[in-house]
């Protein structure tokens, strides 16, 4: 057995022992639904005044109107 093969065998053995140890410590228990919601919950955000807006409901002011930008183009922006 050469050095590379021995290293691979030790790496696999350490991985197997680590997985068994994690399983005994509850490392592979599934998340509860509340935990998943807490982890992936998005905080409510809104688009501030003067920024472009695709929809009215995303503006902090709940108002999105067409305005002329610095290039003379009509763009929707939050009021």
Curated annotation (Swiss-Prot):
Where does it localize? Secreted
Keyword Signal in record = yes
List, alphabetically, the Pfam families matched: Omega-toxin
Which tissues is this protein detected in according to the database? Expressed by the venom gland.
Q: Which residue positions hold the site described Critical for insecticidal activity?
A: 52, 69
GO annotation (BP), single: defense response
- Alphabetized InterPro entries for the sequence: Omega-atracotox
Residue ranges of the propeptide: 23-40
Instruction: Indicate the principal place this protein occupies in or around the cell.
Output: secreted
Query: Quick one: signal sequence residues?
Result: 1-22
* SS bonds (residue pairs): 46-60, 53-64, 59-78
Tell me if Secreted is a UniProt keyword of this record. yes
Q: Which family does the similarity line name?
A: Belongs to the neurotoxin 08 (Shiva) family. 01 (omega toxin) subfamily.
As for what it does, the entry says: Inhibits insect, but not mammalian, voltage-gated calcium channels (Cav).
**Domain notes, please?**
The presence of a 'disulfide through disulfide knot' structurally defines this protein as a knottin.
Output this protein's name.
Omega-hexatoxin-Hi1f
